[in-house]
Regions:
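Catalytic cores of the polymerase beta-like nucleotidyltransferase superfamily
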Residues: 1-305
């Protein structure tokens, strides 16, 4: 199956971003691809990367002529979400790990009905063996290897509202997965509940000075506070991922990404941008006009200086 109609629609939706994603060899996966095949409105694009070069190329591409200008929506230790100028669909770069192929991404997903991907390296769709049958039956089949089962539990309710069903056996499996987490610190608790799938509850579990962790205290915090989405754009996010290569990339880009949270590209960052990554320079030198586009940034209408 070639899925030429779906490929054409994807190109139309991504517009100029499509070529940048090809260069970064990204993998588009999850609900966005499911929505593409069920003719449902796409809310956002979840993008995964094979290696350091791919992620660096993608971030550099955001500043290129091909992308135009973008605005950062949020930055956590798991994901970076931005909205390209002129686009209605945010893109979320998954930055907590690298993935060699689409099936490596599926290994970390929670529902088989979302295990569909588009590989920009091959420009082909990839599917888990259970994807079509669970999607057609609107059935929640949980992957026991998923990274964040607490978030999965929250997503079960969301998918039930969409008409999906979950068996008692699957729900019990999910409860046992959560029970096996052995949550023993505020840091681990925050890691389990924040920064993915649009759920950001980390502020709730920030301890007071010297406050020791306990499940009872965590429950008290939930009872005292409404579950609110954290406003990531209020301040720079500290990247605390475990992968050292990803952490290196995100720490280098943190300041410039934060400026994007409060406005469009500022020419003060041009010098830092050139120094920070050779990937950025090599990417732009490969384009017509080299890196001359940086000179035009100073006078573009979005420049706040």
């Amino acid at each position: 199956m070639k899925f030429e109609v779906e490929k054409a629609r994807l190109k139309w939706l991504l517009d100029d971003q499509y070529e940048v994603l090809k260069k970064s060899r990204a993998i588009l996966a999850g609900g966005c691809v499911t929505s593409l095949f069920t003719n449902v409105e796409i809310n956002d694009f979840d993008l995964y990367f094979r290696d350091k070069e791919g992620l660096s190329t993608q971030i550099a591409g955001m500043f290129s002529q091909e992308y135009g200008y973008y605005q950062l929506h949020h930055l956590t230790n798991k994901a970076l979400m931005y909205i390209a100028r002129g686009s209605d669909n945010p893109c979320q770069l998954i930055v907590f790990d690298f993935f060699k192929d689409a099936h490596a991404v599926f290994d970390r997903f929670d529902f088989t009905a979302n295990m569909a991907a588009f590989d920009f390296e091959t420009e082909e769709f990839v599917f888990h063996e259970d994807f079509w049958k669970d999607l057609s039956a609107r059935r929640i089949n949980i992957n026991p290897k998923t990274d964040y089962p607490i978030i999965t539990a929250l997503r079960v309710d969301k998918y039930k509202q969409k008409g999906y069903t979950i068996s008692k056996a699957q729900y019990l499996k999910l409860m046992l997965m959560i029970n096996s987490l052995e949550i023993d610190s505020w840091e681990f608790m925050r890691d389990q509940v924040g920064g993915m799938y649009g759920y950001s509850f980390e502020e709730i579990f920030k301890p007071q000075d010297g406050e020791e962790f306990s499940i009872e205290k965590a429950i008290e915090k939930i009872e005292k506070l409404s579950l609110i989405r954290e406003r990531w754009y209020d301040k720079p996010a500290e990247f605390a991922g475990n992968n050292p290569e990803i952490k290196e990339i995100m720490e280098k880009w943190k300041d410039i990404l934060h400026e994007k949270q409060i406005g469009w590209y500022n020419s003060k960052n041009v010098e830092r941008f050139n120094q920070w990554t050779q990937i950025a320079s090599s990417y732009n030198e490969a384009d017509e006009g080299g890196i001359d586009w940086l000179d035009s940034v100073v006078t573009n209408p979005f420049d706040k200086e």
